[in-house]
């Protein structure tokens, strides 16, 4: 009869195998190109026989595929390995002010399908928003399955749905506590959408800015940077060594409510002079003298065709530079990643922004501030939501064997 010590040892060995498998699977996923078993052994520090056994299990499960053997200069030919992108997929759904967007992503990060439709969410009938969102998700799942079937996988695993919300959600993951831009307060949208879809275990919801950060972390592995995004307001996050630092309440990096002028305009948060009071969608529309329904790209275009365009660029560039410099000085990091419509705004304010950063950011004493634009400025949140659905497979691929 097996004793307690034998059972404990078996559990330890099983846990070790699971950790090693996750390590190897993650290396295949992050390689950017096909890798061999020998490459994985060298990168992971595991023995070649151990790596081979782990890879064989992943191949048998359909999570990893082998390519044609490639002859090397020395030794046996190498068999390239890569993730089977059609093995499973997840869906990200983003609820925005005037639009609802959904994207389906395969295991290897490729977008399998995307769709969106225009809807004035704040003024729309609430039940209509629920029904239309559910219909969008169902249609996208069908499209993703067809793409996977065309790629040779007839029964891909559906990893579920992640919802991106421009606001705060309750810990019960059923209620949106506050999404001012949608005019939603204490709205049980998460619960109602889950019920409409019939999804239970495969449904999650997060703040849109948090999900956008997740996308950027994947694009900048292991790096430290300040993430700043604009969709309706100004949001941000702190990433240290590839990990999002949330702070005590999960609000770390909320640069939008950094005060840049204590005598400045009133912000929607009730405080004066926040950077959001200058750079929010509403603030830019009012400054450009356009209607509240005007698309942000048109708003920015109108703003800088104005006779006062140079003055506007100088003021907005300087104020954003002050906010960024303050944050960089506190965090002692040198990189900023901009997303959302800040990417569209950047060419117009780049000069005064750079000048302010040079004069105020302490990092310039030993280097310079690296200012980057997101590669997916308008879709970072929904793509991050897709990434969130894939996480369970990468965290523990052994569960999917």
Where are these regions (language model features)?
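Phosphate-binding/catalytic loop of phosphoryl-transfer enzymes
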Residues: 93, 151-153, 157-164, 168-285, ...
């Amino acid at each position: 009869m097996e004793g307690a010590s034998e059972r404990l040892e078996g559990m330890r060995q099983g846990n070790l195998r699971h950790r090693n498998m996750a390590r190897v699977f993650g290396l295949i996923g992050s390689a950017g190109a096909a890798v061999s078993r020998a490459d994985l052994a060298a990168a992971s520090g595991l023995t070649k026989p151990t790596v081979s056994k782990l890879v064989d299990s992943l191949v048998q499960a359909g999570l990893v595929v082998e390519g044609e053997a490639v002859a090397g200069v020395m030794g046996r030919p190498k068999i390239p390995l890569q993730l089977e992108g059609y093995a499973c997929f997840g869906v990200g759904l983003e609820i925005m002010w005037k639009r609802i967007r959904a994207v389906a992503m395969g295991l290897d990060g490729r977008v399998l399908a995307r769709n969106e439709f225009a809807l004035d969410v704040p003024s729309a009938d609430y039940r209509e928003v629920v029904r239309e969102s559910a219909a969008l998700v169902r249609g996208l799942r069908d499209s993703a399955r067809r793409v996977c079937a065309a790629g040779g996988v007839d029964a891909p695993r559906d990893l579920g749905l992640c919802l991106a919300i421009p606001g705060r959600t309750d810990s019960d993951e059923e209620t949106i506590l506050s999404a001012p831009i949608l005019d939603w307060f204490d709205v049980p949208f998460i619960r109602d959408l889950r019920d409409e879809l019939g999804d239970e275990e495969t449904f999650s919801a997060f703040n849109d800015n948090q999900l956008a950060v997740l996308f950027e972390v994947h694009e900048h592995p292991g790096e430290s940077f300040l993430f700043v995004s604009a969709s309706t307001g100004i949001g941000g996050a702190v990433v240290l060594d590839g990990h999002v630092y949330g702070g005590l309440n999960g609000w770390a990096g909320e640069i939008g409510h950094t005060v840049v002028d204590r005598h400045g305009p009133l912000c929607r948060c009730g405080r004066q002079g926040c950077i959001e009071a200058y750079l929010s969608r509403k603030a830019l529309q009012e400054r450009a003298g356009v209607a509240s329904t005007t698309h942000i790209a048109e708003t920015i275009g109108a703003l800088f065709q104005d006779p006062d365009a140079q003055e506007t660029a100088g003021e907005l560039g300087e104020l954003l530079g002050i906010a960024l410099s303050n944050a960089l000085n506190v965090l002692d990091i040198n990189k900023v990643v901009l997303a959302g419509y800040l990417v569209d705004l950047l060419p117009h304010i780049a000069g005064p922004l750079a000048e302010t950063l040079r004069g105020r950011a302490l990092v310039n004493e030993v280097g310079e501030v690296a200012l980057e634009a997101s590669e997916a400025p308008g879709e970072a949140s929904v793509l991050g939501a897709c990434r969130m659905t894939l996480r369970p497979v990468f965290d523990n691929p052994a569960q999917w064997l």
